[in-house]
């Protein structure tokens, strides 16, 4: 929710509609986001926006997870959700196809291929990124969530995104990326 926008509102509404949840929980990064970037909006204002728009409880994702690659980010969030004894996890996806994403999640990562890439001097996150370069950012995170919930009771609730993560178009369901860029200019 960096910043909170209509797409987030849509996700909350759809997740509540699809799950009939009594309580909506959001796991939210603190002052720093993935890749170690500072949040555009402070965590207090983001949490307030979430609560004003349908979230009942906001749980802070510890920095050690919030600033990591997608698989660690997802695992940290799922670990917190397991502690909260939730039934569902909702996340966005560009492709909107849970079967395809589940198939990808069930396919073992070729560690030898990652090691070969890393042997050229590339970091693990970059090597992993190269292997998943055909996927959109939210689909990558969706696959990581699916892997993280594999041996839990948590069921996935996929919400198809109508815009891409890096879509710069300002529209009713604009991406957070587009909103941040518009505010900076």
Predicted regions mapped to residue ranges:
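Short, high-confidence coil segments that cap the C-terminus of an alpha-helix
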Residues: 18-22, 55, 86
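Non-catalytic positions within long, well-ordered alpha-helices that form the structural scaffold/packing
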Residues: 16-17, 51, 78-82
